[in-house]
Amino acid sequence: MKTVPAMLGTPRLFREFFILHLGLWSILCEKATKRNDEECPVQLTITRNSKQSARTGELFKIQCPVKYCVHRPNVTWCKHNGTICVPLEVSPQLYTSWEENQSVPVFVLHFKPIHLSDNGSYSCSTNFNSQVINSHSVTIHVRERTQNSSEHPLITVSDIPDATNASGPSTMEERPGRTWLLYTLLPLGALLLLLACVCLLCFLKRIQGKEKKPSDLAGRDTNLVDIPASSRTNHQALPSGTGIYDNDPWSSMQDESELTISLQSERNNQGIVYASLNHCVIGRNPRQENNMQEAPTEYASICVRS
């Protein structure tokens, strides 16, 4: 049994027949598409004499509803300058997008944000089957922002029921930034307060330490003076009221000895400021040691401050 290429003669003839079949099929499909497009043309449904108001610094947008059947057309925005509509250049502050979550797809022009120079009339257009279709114009009135901006709310497109106020997201974006700043400043303020308290405590302790050092030194001097004075007083105490001092050789060699004891007590407890004891001893003459015996003389004075 002969195959199809054999029946056609050669493989080259079979390839040409296949290409001809694809060409005829594409022509038929194109005619059907054109027929559908003619039955359902593209429509740009912007209401005539549409007007909108905006304030500088707001996030603003205008919408162009587009009706189509099969293929989404290529739509552009332009701004009227006299009798000419100048196409807009896309930038981060001025860009377009499609919103197809509605019953009618919408081609949107975004102002992020809007300025006084954006004041004017805008329209959208498309090229459909070698024919340019223009929409009605939308006029935007841009005014300076004042302090009491709540008296002049943003006006949206009247012919689109689902249009939203573009100034809302800006406040929502500002609130997280302010909250983050507040959460950052609170711990920083608490840390500074804690550091100030620690520095104040260290300063007070240092002052108290300086005040304690002179009193400690005075106590040490008093103790050092009291110990030899008491021991010496006990050593030189008389055995009886009428007895004579038994002076040691060292004390007898001195013509006159004077011992002064100064005591300084704490300011709030003791009233005695100082006490002095003068002890005068007439030394023995070693040459007349056997013939003469001299009695010592001593006296004490006490001063009390009220």
UniProtKB/Swiss-Prot annotation:
Put simply, this protein is called B- and T-lymphocyte attenuator
Q: Which organism is it from?
A: Mus musculus
Q: Can you tell me where the transmembrane regions are?
A: 184-204
As given in the record, the signal peptide range reads 1-29
- Entry-listed glycosylation sites: 74, 81, 101, 119, 148, 165
Q: Which Gene3D superfamilies match?
A: Immunoglobulins
The gene from which this protein is expressed is Btla
* Recorded consequence of changing residue 85 to W: In strain: 129/SvEv
Q: Describe the task this protein carries out.
A: Inhibitory receptor on lymphocytes that negatively regulates antigen receptor signaling via PTPN6/SHP-1 and PTPN11/SHP-2. May interact in cis (on the same cell) or in trans (on other cells) with TNFRSF14. In cis interactions, appears to play an immune regulatory role inhibiting in trans interactions in naive T cells to maintain a resting state. In trans interactions, can predominate during adaptive immune response to provide survival signals to effector T cells.
Q: Does the keyword Transmembrane apply?
A: yes
